[in-house]
């Protein structure tokens, strides 16, 4: 189900456009979400770059370099005011849907102006896939230790990543 889009300037640094899709139950409780996000630094910030090569894992997806991060998330935590997460949650709230309290998420990023795959660029296509964690029988606290993912998360990560990669298809024109 397509819930809508938003276009905004993020932190006076970049132009963002996001589109949100969900799979939900009859009570509008989200089971899965698909967040497609385009972001470009503003011309007034010519030196700024997105940095993925230092933190995220590199992979070849859809014929190009992509940067991957998986993590558990607590939807009950308030997003930073003005953040892209706040815009994402506002789309969901306005459409009358509810996020589960605990999610498993995958962020897949392609830097559109980084043909060499360095992890540094000014324009990105970001795709975020999320699933309700409840069907696993685990909680955020069970898959993290001192704020870092643990062996329980590692067991969930590979199948989650495969579902996320298969959820999106990217074709260049």
Regions found by a protein language model. Give the residues of each.
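Start-of-domain marker
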Residues: 1-5
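Conserved polar/disulfide-associated segments of primarily extracytoplasmic proteins
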Residues: 6-148
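Long, compositionally biased interface segments
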Residues: 136-173
């Amino acid at each position: 189900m397509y819930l809508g889009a938003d276009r905004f300037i993020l932190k006076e640094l970049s132009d963002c456009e996001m589109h949100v899709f969900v799979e939900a139950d009859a009570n509008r409780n989200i089971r899965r979400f698909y967040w497609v996000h385009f972001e470009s630094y503003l011309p007034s910030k010519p030196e700024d770059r997105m940095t993925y090569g230092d933190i995220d894992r590199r992979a070849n997806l859809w014929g190009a370099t992509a940067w991957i991060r998986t993590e558990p998330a607590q939807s009950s935590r308030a997003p930073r005011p003005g953040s892209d997460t706040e815009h994402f949650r506002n789309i969901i709230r306005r459409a009358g849907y509810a996020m589960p309290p605990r999610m498993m998420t995958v962020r897949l990023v392609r830097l559109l102006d980084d043909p060499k795959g360095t992890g540094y660029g000014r324009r990105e296509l970001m795709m975020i896939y999320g699933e309700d964690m409840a069907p696993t029988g685990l909680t955020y606290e069970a898959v993290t230790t001192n704020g870092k993912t643990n062996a329980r998360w590692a067991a969930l990560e590979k199948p989650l990543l495969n579902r996320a990669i298969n959820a999106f298809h990217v074709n260049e024109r």
